[in-house]
């Protein structure tokens, strides 16, 4: 009897040490390995991994995304009559930590992984996700390499340079601006690509190859933008695309106000969804500003209303949800729909129908093995979920209508938020 007690105490001590030193992710691995009796309960749950930066320099964004996932989980906590269990991995905003964390998450066999914010920590996870054949959905990372190099990594937002098309549509079709200029920082490749799409779209819409009256670059080592601002004034531009990050944009706009260049509409990037920049713009009644976003309460679907109501109920009526939280809410629901669709597909297909989908004997055997596994466990495999995620069309999300159209890059409407006279005006939607 004493031996049994000593062994139990030893296990508990080791467990406490492991949990204290390495955190909950390692604890879950420890529990799965040494307490197999819990496997019955695990079969009644479907796991969704959260690979996010909840500490480190990206933690503000990471925490906002986790809020959206958890809120969706509170509203929709089951799928296929099974409880959805959220398992967490904090990459600490570090590619080195992220490499370990993603492997720990994968070892717990999640059906889908959500995250991360931050391009580097997302890219470092990509190869492991692909090797494990687990579909993942990045919520806010927009680097095209994430989805281009990995068919298992999906985006829940629009590709970065597409905002150039949307802003051109807004400027020309929505506001009648047919004489425009562009501004970017020197050596900013992403801004260069986005501006190229903007200018090409403007030329196509207007039918005028000379509608771009100025293309300006700002030196990274100088904060004096007087020369460029005066050049814009002389150009006669009616709208200016400022492909600048929030801090530089605020400095530029402040100087434009000081120099009384306020008769133009300033078009910004998605990154302008920034609290400090928004506070500044709203404090300047002479500024006329528009910028793209995945989310606006002024453009509402039934899911948007559900999301906002749930958010305010949990966090307070005076609290406003961020774009990141809305997209994360959608990413979780996209995962659930793909899981449900995948299992429905499995149950509808016969073994012969599965075999007929593949040409070689090896692929047929692998597909049939996964088909049998899903039927036995009641949980579809990663490949099956990935297949159905690709097929999602016209998904009604809090951040808009989302489709994948057989790919892993989201196609969705882009909302152009508009602030004039210090107040938010009616938003414009580009399909």
Question: Can you annotate each of these PLM segments?
Answer:
Residues 1-11:
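Bacterial N-terminal signal peptides that target proteins for export
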């Amino acid at each position: 009897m004493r031996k049994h007690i000593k062994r139990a105490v030893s296990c508990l001590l080791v467990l406490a040490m492991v949990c204290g030193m390495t955190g909950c992710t390692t604890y879950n691995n420890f529990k799965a390995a040494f307490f197999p009796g819990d496997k019955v309960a695990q079969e009644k749950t479907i796991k969704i991994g959260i690979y996010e930066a909840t500490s480190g320099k990206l933690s503000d964004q990471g925490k906002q995304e986790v809020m959206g996932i958890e809120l969706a989980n509170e509203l929709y906590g089951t799928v296929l009559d099974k409880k959805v269990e959220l398992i967490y991995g904090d990459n600490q905003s570090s590619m080195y930590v992220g490499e370990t964390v993603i492997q720990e998450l994968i070892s717990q066999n999640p059906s889908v992984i959500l995250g991360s914010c931050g391009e580097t920590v997302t890219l470092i996870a990509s190869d492991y996700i692909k090797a494990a054949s687990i579909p993942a959905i990045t919520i806010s990372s927009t680097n095209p390499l994430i989805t281009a190099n990995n068919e298992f990594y999906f985006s829940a937002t629009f590709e970065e340079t597409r905002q150039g098309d949307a802003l051109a549509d807004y400027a020309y079709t929505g506001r009648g601006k047919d004489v425009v200029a562009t501004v970017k920082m020197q050596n900013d490749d992403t801004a260069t690509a986005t501006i190229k799409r903007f200018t090409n779209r403007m030329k196509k819409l207007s039918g005028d190859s000379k509608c771009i009256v100025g293309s300006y670059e700002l030196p990274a080592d100088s904060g004096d933008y007087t020369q460029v601002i005066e050049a814009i004034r002389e150009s006669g531009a009616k709208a200016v695309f400022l492909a600048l990050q929030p801090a530089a944009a605020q400095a530029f706009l402040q100087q434009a106000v000081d120099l009384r260049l306020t008769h133009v509409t300033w078009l910004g990037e998605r990154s302008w969804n920034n609290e400090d920049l928004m506070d500044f713009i709203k404090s300047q009644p002479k500024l006329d500003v528009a910028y793209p976003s995945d989310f606006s309460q002024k453009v509402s679907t039934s899911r948007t209303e559900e999301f906002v109501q749930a958010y305010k109920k949990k966090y307070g009526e005076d609290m406003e949800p961020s774009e990141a939280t809305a997209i994360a809410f959608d990413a979780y629901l996209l995962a659930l729909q793909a899981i449900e669709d995948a299992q429905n597909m499995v149950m509808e297909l016969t073994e012969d129908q599965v075999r007929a989908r593949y040409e070689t004997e090896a692929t047929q055997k692998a597909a049939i093995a996964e088909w049998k596994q899903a039927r036995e466990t009641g949980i579809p495999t990663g490949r099956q979920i990935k297949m159905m995620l690709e097929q999602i069309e016209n998904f009604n999300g809090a951040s808009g209508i989302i489709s994948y159209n057989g790919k892993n890059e989201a196609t969705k409407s882009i909302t152009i938020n508009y602030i004039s006279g210090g107040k938010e005006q009616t938003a414009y939607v580009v399909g």
